[in-house]
Swiss-Prot record:
Lineage: Eukaryota, Metazoa, Chordata, Craniata, Vertebrata
Organism in which the protein naturally occurs: Salmo salar
Stretches that traverse the bilayer: none
Glycosylation site positions: N125, N361, N385, N390, N500, N540
InterPro entries registered for this protein in UniProt: Aldolase_TIM, GH59_C, GH59_cat, Glyco_hydro_59, Glyco_hydro_59_dom, Glycoside_hydrolase_SF
Protein name per UniProt: Galactocerebrosidase
SS bond list: C269-C376
EC number: 3.2.1.46
Positions that bind substrate: T91, W133, N179, R378
Keywords, comma-separated and alphabetical: Disulfide bond, Glycoprotein, Glycosidase, Hydrolase, Lipid degradation, Lipid metabolism, Lysosome, Signal, Sphingolipid metabolism
Length: 666
């Protein structure tokens, strides 16, 4: 018994000793500096991740943009990376190309131009990056490969960069190759040549937006390729790099990272990798996929953004924890600052980085995220331990004379569920060139000489609510601000506002599917085009739309309800699809591909004439009207039980839609 008492006392003393004794860390620029900091950013696209953002009414849309881009307000991002739209499915939808066809150029399609302008308006120094996920079909000459004609691909990409400047006064700083797909050395060299020939010497190339290898090996053995590439960009590197990448002396970036549900564990993931991407892997930029979760949440990777803005119909948005975790770094350091060599891991878990502008300013960011509270979506996270600890930082070199540091703290507090983020504490007085902190687990601290930090706020946005049960759009917009109609989320193909000059009647302004050739794809696009809309929970509803086929004999269009899949799974989407064809037939199918037929027959429909389709789904039965008259009824629908409404075409073909309406009971 006495032995046990002595043991207990000794154990308590040991624990107290471990906690009370502060480990010491030196922050010193005399020993030399580390790598130049290039910034923290967000990625819009790859794909259609900002689709719903553009539909927000003011002031809410501007408030969201302020939280993302406005300096000293929210995330204060240094980098905006966007998809160079390629008319193909690239995760959560398609983004339109500026060149659907070889003789076509339109630099006002989509919303990435607008987003870059808004970012630049708030932060003129923001770095802009463009990267293709897919390419229009003509670039590949009918093959699902962009490198057989590298001169065409290079000219296509460069035209996007030139258009950004000519039409929007946007200087693109970096361009990538082909997101997470094979690179081609010949193409990269030709891209560099084409950029230079076009007066774009300042535009730098990132390669290859995939894994560290094989691009690193290729750079080591091909000097001409090495001369063309400025940044090695890796995706989801797990905070580590490879020796060969370090040997190249190139900038190393985590050019896509995070991709994690933006709850507090997601915030913890972001906190850990923002520090440890440099501590472990010497990566000087980290870019979040995605910038803002502004797409239907039931599409793939719902809420995997720095914040959430998925309800333009209510105006509701949520400033999630990753916004404030970002601010711990972005509000107190800028691209061009330099990491100290004295960065690293804390003895009892966690990490610290320090940056300087070489003009006397110092910013230190500390994170103590535990394993289970910082798991990212990928790669797998090996076990590690973090415990409460005291730490002492000794300021050396040019920092020895610092007398005061501003302090900002975030505490996740998974135990009591009372977290707080980006809280300004009292300034820390420095005594004898050192200071001591008591760190708990799952915290983030910033200590800095910069005094301009601010936790920006706006009045609470409107409360959350479902998509309207009664919805109508006649597309009568003479001068639309964007090329796409609100709330429609294209999943294969591109649906654009169209002025139908051949129809002086009620269908002058329509929505038109415009992609006529399978693109060079990134995901597995459907063979049919489809755009979804509404509430994924919808079960019993009526969908009505006027349709106009533009392909004789083989043309076909549909309206649909209960569509259960989008994104990279769109080919396998099920639902209730009501098709009419230009050969005078109709079909009702339980799937997009059209294999499971629920009803079929003659419709008398032809191309180049308007027809009104009405689909009602109630319980296990579906009924269809053509031009207001019953065409088929009581088709048995065993599943799915719920899903979006949709419109689309039988193939990559031109077709128009007008007066789209939904009336849902649930």
């Amino acid at each position: 018994m006495i032995y046990k008492l002595y043991f207990a006392i000794a154990l308590c003393f040991s624990l107290c000793f471990d906690l009370c004794i502060a480990e010491s860390y030196v922050l010193d620029d005399k020993v030399g500096l580390g790598r130049t900091f290039d910034g923290i950013g967000g990625l819009s696209g790859g794909g259609a991740t900002s689709r719903l953002l553009v539909n927000y009414a003011e002031p809410y849309r501007s408030q969201i943009l302020d939280y993302l881009f406005k300096p000293n307000f929210g995330a204060s991002l240094h980098i905006l990376k966007v998809e160079i739209g390629g008319d193909a499915q690239t995760t959560d939808g398609t983004e339109p190309s500026h060149m659907h066809y070889e003789n076509d150029e339109n630099f006002f399609r989509g919303y990435e131009w607008w987003l870059m302008r808004e970012a630049k308006k708030r932060n003129p120094n923001i770095t802009l990056i463009g990267l293709p996920w897919a390419f229009p079909g003509w670039v590949g000459h009918g093959k699902n490969w962009p490198y057989d004609f590298p001169d065409i691909t290079a000219s296509y990409v460069v035209s996007w960069i030139l258009g950004a400047k000519h039409y929007h006064d946007l200087n693109i700083d970096y361009v990538g190759i082909w997101n997470e797909r094979n690179f081609d050395s010949k193409y990269i060299k030709l891209l560099r040549y084409t950029l230079d020939k076009s007066g774009l010497e300042r535009v730098r190339i990132i390669a290859s937006d995939n894994l560290w290898q094989p691009i690193t090996y290729s750079l080591c053995v091909d000097q001409e390729l090495a001369d063309a590439v400025d940044v090695i960009g890796a995706h989801y590197p797990g905070t580590t790099t490879v020796i060969e990448a370090l040997k190249t002396q190139k900038k190393l970036w985590s050019s896509e990272d995070y991709s994690t549900f933006n709850d507090e564990v997601g915030g913890g993931c972001w906190a850990r990798i923002l520090n440890q991407n440099y501590v472990n892997g010497l990566m000087t930029a980290t870019i979040s996929w995605n910038l803002v979760a502004s797409y239907y949440e039931d599409l793939p990777f719902g809420r995997d953004g720095l914040m959430t803005a998925e309800e333009p119909w209510t105006g509701n948005y949520v400033v999630e924890s990753p916004i404030w975790i970002t601010a711990h770094t972005t509000q107190f350091s800028q691209p061009g600052w330099t990491y100290l060599q004295t960065v690293g891991h804390l003895v009892h878990g966690g990490s610290y980085v320090a940056l300087t502008d070489s003009n006397g300013n110092l910013t230190v960011v500390i994170e103590t995220m535990t394993h289970d509270h910082s798991v990212c979506i990928r790669p797998p996270l090996l076990p590690f331990n973090v415990t409460a600890q005291n730490v002492t930082f000794q300021l050396k070199g040019s920092f020895a004379l610092i007398k005061e540091l501003q302090v900002w703290q975030s505490r996740f507090d998974f135990k009591t569920k009372k977290p707080f983020f980006f809280k300004k504490l009292s300034p820390l007085k420095i005594s004898d060139g050192s200071f001591t902190l008591s760190l708990d687990v799952d915290e983030v601290y910033t200590l800095t000489t910069i005094s301009t930090g601010l936790k920006g706020t706006y009045p609470d946005p409107p409360t959350s609510g479902p998509f309207p049960k009664v919805y109508f759009d006649d597309f009568n917009v003479a001068n639309p601000s964007f090329s796409e109609a609100p709330d429609f989320a294209d999943q294969t193909g591109v649906f654009e506002y169209y002025i139908n000059l051949t129809d002086p009647g009620p269908h002058v302004f329509t929505l038109r599917q415009v992609v006529t050739q399978m693109p060079v794809t990134w995901a597995t696009d459907a063979d049919q085009t489809i755009s979804v809309i509404g509430d994924y929970k919808w079960q019993n509803l009526t969908v009505t739309c006027d349709v106009f086929m533009e392909t004789v004999k083989t043309g076909g269009v549909f309206i649909a309800a209960r569509v259960d899949k989008g994104g990279q799974s769109v080919r396998s989407a099920k639902g209730v699809f009501f098709w009419v064809f230009a050969d005078g037939s109709y079909k009702v199918t339980n799937d997009l591909v059209g294999k499971t037929v629920l009803a079929e027959g003659l419709s008398g429909t032809r191309a180049y004439g308007w027809h009104t389709l009405t689909l009602t789904v109630e319980g296990q039965y579906a009924t269809g009207l053509l031009n207001g008259y019953p065409l088929w009824k009581d088709a048995v629908v065993l599943g799915p039980k719920n899903g979006w409404a949709a419109i689309g075409t039988h193939s990559f073909e031109l077709a128009q839609f007008d007066n789209f309406a939904v009336e849902a009971k649930l």
